[in-house]
Amino acid sequence: MPNLKAIRDRIQSVKNTKKITEAMRLVAAAKVRRAQEQVLSTRPFADALAQVLYNLQNRLSFAETELPLFEQREPKAVALLVVTGDRGLCGGYNVNAIKRAEQRAKELKNQGIAVKLVLVGSKAKQYFGRRDYDVAASYANLEQIPNASEAAQIADSLVALFVSETVDRVELIYTRFVSLISSQPVVQTLFPLSPQGLEAPDDEIFRLITRGGKFQVEREKVEAPVESFPQDMIFEQDPVQILEALLPLYNTNQLLRALQESAASELAARMTAMSNASDNAGQLIGTLTLSYNKARQAAITQELLEVVAGANSL
């Protein structure tokens, strides 16, 4: 017969665990909202910067301009910037990003291209640090909500690797935020920048909403800015100098958006994992309660049988 006290203790233990997972789910949801607000707050600057660069590139011929970040070289070494999180309990977020990085590194090595890693997040640092990889730099224990200063620090180190010709290309591997239950590790080339110039692509923003008592994500497509400078506008400085001054801001902004997407993906994965854990805990509590009631009923029945048997023996 099951031990009633043991079952009772386990029910209480699972209830306590459920309280923790539910609290973690709500905290992750609040942080997803903060990530959403940060993306929205940085949009005006990002839009203005994209507009300036987009119009500058229409006035310049990059084929005739010697800008280091646009230099196309035969790739002999490639730097991979791998973005993961600092903590676990977020489903397959970290594992999927690391697997994609390993897959890309293997593809490059099979082509005879050397690979250097720049790691963001404790999970990537721990994993690749124990294996035979050339780690050029690592960044761990960053702010949970990425900020521009951290993005600028990482971007500067990547620019230094590329401009010094330590590497001939820089690729970014991060997790694109799709929805609360879906995220996708993607590979994006950071350097060299496109020789055809900077484009002004359409963008998307996300919003966390509640529907039917559950969290959901709405994605909104944002059209690229179409305004342009007057053709007769005169620059006090050489447009090339203006472009060189704005490129660091552009690089930082591109990296910041990727870090924001990765942070949102991690928080969404954690929220989903904790939601599933809470649901599983609820089911386990129901199963244990049923077992407890059955055991208690069996114990009462046994006691009654013993009493009746004792009475009949008199």
Swiss-Prot record:
Checking Pfam families in the record gives: ATP-synt (PF00231)
Q: Name one GO cellular component term.
A: proton-transporting ATP synthase complex
Q: Which PROSITE patterns match?
A: ATPASE_GAMMA
Does Zinc appear among the keywords? no
Task: Give the transmembrane ranges.
Answer: none
Membrane among keywords: yes
Gene3D superfamilies given in the database record = 3.40.1380.10, ATP synthase, gamma subunit, helix hairpin domain
Q: What biological-process GO terms show up in the record?
A: proton motive force-driven ATP synthesis
Where is this protein localized, as stated in its record?
Cellular thylakoid membrane
What's the protein's topology in the membrane?
Peripheral membrane protein
- GO MF: ATP binding; proton-transporting ATP synthase activity, rotational mechanism
* Name of the featured protein: ATP synthase gamma chain
Native organism is Synechocystis sp. (strain ATCC 27184 / PCC 6803 / Kazusa)
